[in-house]
Amino acid sequence: MGPMAHRSHTGTGPSQRQLRVGELIRRTLADVLNRGEIHDPELNRLSITVGEVRCSPDLKVATVHVMPLGGKDVEEAISLLSKHRGELRHHITRQMTLKYAPDLRFRPDETFDRLDETRRLFSDKTVMRDIRGGGEADED
């Protein structure tokens, strides 16, 4: 059996390992931020939600989707997290046994924006009528 023998994932989405490692990184970062383990008063005054972490197939890059409470100060939060990238990586390596500590890249979590848009759509009168079956439905 060669080194590629364990590769059974052939789909286009993330593998189970990518999902599992991403979730472990998400939990670790959320815990570190909640406990204020990064000694930066500017960062600790922000209540940051770690929404999702997506890992590259080789697990060397982790894209961390974050949002400060209330959706304000997003750029400041990303800047502060990026500034403390090394310390955050250190916390991850202490919690997990990975061959490489992933490079952390911080991005705004737009899940909340999509959720607001979905709520807005569901409150639209036309959409509500269609959901209740009062609209004309096209049969395909």
Swiss-Prot record:
GO CC list: cytosol
Coiled-coil ranges from the UniProt annotation: none
Highest taxon of source: Bacteria
SUPFAM superfamilies: Ribosome-binding factor A, RbfA
Entry keyword annotation includes Cytoplasm: yes
Pfam families on file: RBFA
Keyword annotations: Cytoplasm, Ribosome biogenesis
Record GO biological process: maturation of SSU-rRNA
Alphabetical list of PROSITE patterns matching this protein: RBFA
Keyword Cytoplasm among record annotations: yes
GO MF entries: ribosomal small subunit binding
Position of the signal peptide: none
InterPro entries assigned to the protein according to its UniProt record, in alphabetical order: KH_dom-like_a/b (IPR015946), RbfA (IPR000238), RbfA_dom_sf (IPR023799), Ribosome-bd_factorA_CS (IPR020053)
HAMAP family according to UniProt: RbfA (MF_00003)
Subunit and partners: Monomer. Binds 30S ribosomal subunits, but not 50S ribosomal subunits or 70S ribosomes.
Record function comment: One of several proteins that assist in the late maturation steps of the functional core of the 30S ribosomal subunit. Associates with free 30S ribosomal subunits (but not with 30S subunits that are part of 70S ribosomes or polysomes). Required for efficient processing of 16S rRNA. May interact with the 5'-terminal helix region of 16S rRNA.
Record family assignment: Belongs to the RbfA family.
Protein name, per record: Ribosome-binding factor A
Organism: Cereibacter sphaeroides (strain ATCC 17023 / DSM 158 / JCM 6121 / CCUG 31486 / LMG 2827 / NBRC 12203 / NCIMB 8253 / ATH 2.4.1.) (Rhodobacter sphaeroides)
